[in-house]
Amino acid sequence: MLAYRYLGWTLVVYGLGYVLAPIEPSIDIAPGSLWLWLASAAMCMAGLRVAPWLQRQWQPAVAHATFSLRQASQRLNLLAASGLLCTLIDRYALRGVPLDFDFFAARDVLEATAPTAIGVVGALLGALACFSLGLMVARATDGERLTSLDWAHSVAIFSVYVGISMGVGSRSTLLVAIISTMFSVIWLRKAWGRPLHLRYWLVPLAVLLLVAVISAALMLERLDLMGLDPMLSIEYSGYAYTVRPSSGTLLWLTEHSDSAPLLVAGFSLLQYVYHGLFEFSLFAQEPFVEHTGGSVTFWLPLKLLNVLQLNLGTVDFESIAGWREGIFTTFLGPLYLDFGGLLPVAAFLLFLALGLPAAALHRGRLALLPYCSVLCALCVLFPVVNLLDSASGAYPLVASMIVPWLGRRRGQVQCNEPTPDRWQAP
């Protein structure tokens, strides 16, 4: 997997989209902040570009013949179902999250109570559900005959995983799961030399459109719970602080706010997508930031250690000068909070580390497809949000590292890894 290309094309499409979008900034980006962001983004691409070369120096090309897709898929579904059950027990039985689908009440309870050990285990194992459909597609692409029950199991696990997240008003889990699955489908067909017919591009576009509609509907539901008009969100939300609709667009939205509330909520998604770079500029200009040395980027390992009663502490975001809750600062904002002026160096090293497993997939390690699908989602959402800073990205990334062990078999066995004569690495 040449991950740097995904990141590069994402940045190009993001820039072109900004030029065409009917939005205008409320503030000017400071040149110094912009150059820092661009330099750091370039270093992220450089880290991904160097990773394949470095991986070749460390590990010569060898044949991997001990990974069974069928075994990995079946074990993954079992563990994912167990993890989702643990998550439900933790949230609704142990921590008292209400069952009335009130997003804000659910979030208040989760923020006021500490996760139990059952909840942490459930979050890690449940995140395997993100790859349930992707592995089923891999099995089908490899020629295995799958029953309707096989597909039903995976669809059910995938749906429950997304539904649990949407129950607290989160859209990012849905987005990560969909992007990861779409990447797996397209990548697998290219890897096996199968044609990518028009439907394989139209279906992902239709799915992304559906995700946008669902996200807009969720936003309307949240605004309704808050008793706010959608137009107020466009003009006065945290996103609107830096990005507003153009004058003509604002007039049109005002005239149609009652007849087309979904379009109004959809415009909020544009603000959601494009406000991060401007927020990064504001935050990078804050002179009194106390940098956290990695506690934000690597919050999940710290959380796991804290569950073991090591009490390493957490980041108090409310005490950080210039940090605003409820907004995003692209992928690089949390990394800047951690490392400050060393951001380009930190970005290079982080993406070098992230790119090494992706390089192994490019050389035939199909077991790493789930990991690379999350990395693809991370690259696609790079200009918007840092997935490592959220449960929707960090847990699947860690969980994906379990997959190679789930399909590992001892001895010489029939293996689903693509052999050199049919492998065409994208």
Regions found by a protein language model. Give the residues of each.
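A structural signal for hydrophobic alpha-helical transmembrane segments in multi-pass membrane proteins
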Residues: 1-93
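Membrane-interfacial loop-to-transmembrane alpha-helix junctions, especially the N-terminal start
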Residues: 2-11, 72-77, 144-154, 360-373
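Membrane-interface helix caps and helix-loop-helix hairpins in membrane proteins
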Residues: 26-27, 163-172, 383-391
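Hydrophobic core segments of transmembrane alpha-helices in multi-pass, intramembrane catalytic enzymes
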Residues: 36-43, 126-134, 172-184, 347, ...
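Membrane-embedded catalytic interface detector for glycan/lipid assembly enzymes
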Residues: 56-225, 334, 413-426
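Transmembrane alpha-helical segments in integral membrane proteins
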Residues: 127-145, 264-277, 352-357
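Small-residue-enriched transmembrane helix-hairpin modules in multi-pass membrane proteins
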Residues: 213-347
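Hydrophobic alpha-helical segments
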Residues: 315-318, 323-426
